[in-house]
Amino acid sequence: IDKYWENQPFYPQSKAFIHDLKYAGKAGRDKIYDIQESLAATFIDYYILTSLDSIAWLLNIRGNDIDYTPLLCCFAIIPQKGNVELFVEEKKIRSIKNELEKFVNPHSFESIYEFIGKIGKDKIVGMDKKQTAYNFKKICLNSNITINYLSNPCTYPKAQKNEIELSGARNANIRDGASITKFLYWLKNIMKISETNEIKAADYLLNLRKEHELFYS
């Protein structure tokens, strides 16, 4: 598709930032240890992780590469031991590089293909069949690397919210509920139908939500 798609939009270049521990509830290093234990139990040497929300959760990082979703365009490879290999444009993580390098080895985005090719034919690589591009499978097969199709190991741990995450979700709903209440009052008692349309109403609600300290969009 890239060969024939003219006038493609520019590749997103947002800057990554750390999702603070006071909101995450668990350090990235600790999450990595847990995932690596699950890889060891299934005899997987490396796991190719392409799910952006899983990478964001695992490393406690966020970005703004996708509208309305705080994600960073990147890939990750989780080894059974040691630092996670993160493939992302260097300028995106420059401001948080020192923090990340405590548990991450950063690489250029495109170098993931070369990295996989050099893993070694005696290694077992895990990947989620539903989430991983065929190109990664092809590289593994061409390099005589054994593939073990395994569901994304971050999915269930990410779904099991810790107490800080649960508290954050509840507080977010309380804040948003206050915005909705103000909006409904405005809709019923103040709004003039002749001067308002759906877009103006949506903008009014958005501005109410923006009044809260932790609003992000």
Spell out what each predicted region is.
Residues 1-217:
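Active-site neighborhoods and metal-handling regions in enzymes and metal-associated proteins
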